[in-house]
């Protein structure tokens, strides 16, 4: 039997809102790990430009750029790194493209005031992940990649360190994301329980960002004892 590449087996991964710092960092790391990537943006030209930058950094990368809705329709696996203030409206229009699919929420609703990062309210939900699940009930939502600093993700010469906390009410979806995490050198997936605990994962990010500001560092999470 002919050998099949990893990207051919798992299919395309769409990163919606992928032109920002976190999205670009994830696109670079996933492309380097052999994923077939589509970067989504509200503006097609920005998506194509981001895809070109990934190809320049990872010459063998399979990456394209599309508008967010087109990227969501194309892929079976979705990563959300969209601006939180427009998320509710986006989910209203994109819901049919997300239903039944693996949806990885990597968003954190942060604001920084006087060098202190804090969470901001996200509609009627206690976390962004729970908001996504409530708006698209048929999506297989997993909270992941919320505590990995974007600057570290974007620096391919830097080996990542830390654990990726995974919260979900879908055990199969959590396992799929764990496999994705394992393909990124230096990261370890950790089952952190049901989706309702995503609020605490998001809170950890506020703490990490504040420490990064105070100590001029790039901190991440590592769980000892596991």
List where the protein language model places each region:
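Rossmann-like NAD(P)-binding element
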Residues: 58-102, 109-115
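A short helix-to-beta-strand connector/capping loop
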Residues: 57-64, 137-140, 187
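NAD(P)+-binding Rossmann beta1-loop-alpha1 motif at the extreme N-terminus of oxidoreductases
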Residues: 2-53, 183
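A glycine-biased structural micro-motif
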Residues: 48, 74, 100, 138-141
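Short beta-strand and adjoining strand-loop segment in the mid-core
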Residues: 116-125, 154-172
């Amino acid at each position: 039997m002919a050998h099949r590449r990893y990207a051919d087996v798992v299919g395309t991964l769409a990163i919606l809102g992928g032109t920002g710092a976190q999205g670009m960092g994830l696109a670079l790391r996933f492309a380097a790990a052999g994923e077939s990537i589509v970067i989504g943006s509200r503006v097609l030209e920005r998506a194509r430009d981001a895809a070109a930058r990934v190809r320049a950094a990872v010459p063998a990368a399979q990456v394209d750029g599309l508008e967010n809705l087109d990227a969501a329709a194309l892929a079976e696996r979705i990563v959300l790194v969209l601006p939180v203030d427009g998320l509710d409206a986006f989910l209203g229009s994109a819901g049919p493209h997300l239903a039944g699919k693996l949806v990885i929420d990597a968003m954190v609703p942060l604001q920084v005031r006087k060098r202190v990062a804090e969470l901001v309210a996200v509609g009627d939900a206690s976390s962004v992940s729970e908001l996504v699940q409530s708006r698209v009930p048929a999506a297989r939502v997993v909270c992941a990649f919320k505590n990995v600093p974007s600057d570290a993700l974007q620096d391919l010469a830097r080996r990542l360190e830390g654990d990726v906390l995974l919260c979900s009410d879908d055990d199969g979806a959590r396992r799929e994301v764990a496999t994705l995490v394992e393909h990124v050198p230096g990261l370890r997936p950790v089952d952190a329980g049901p989706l309702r605990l995503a609020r605490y994962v998001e809170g950890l990010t506020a703490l990490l960002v504040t420490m990064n500001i105070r100590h001029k560092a790039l901190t991440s999470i590592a769980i000892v004892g596991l």
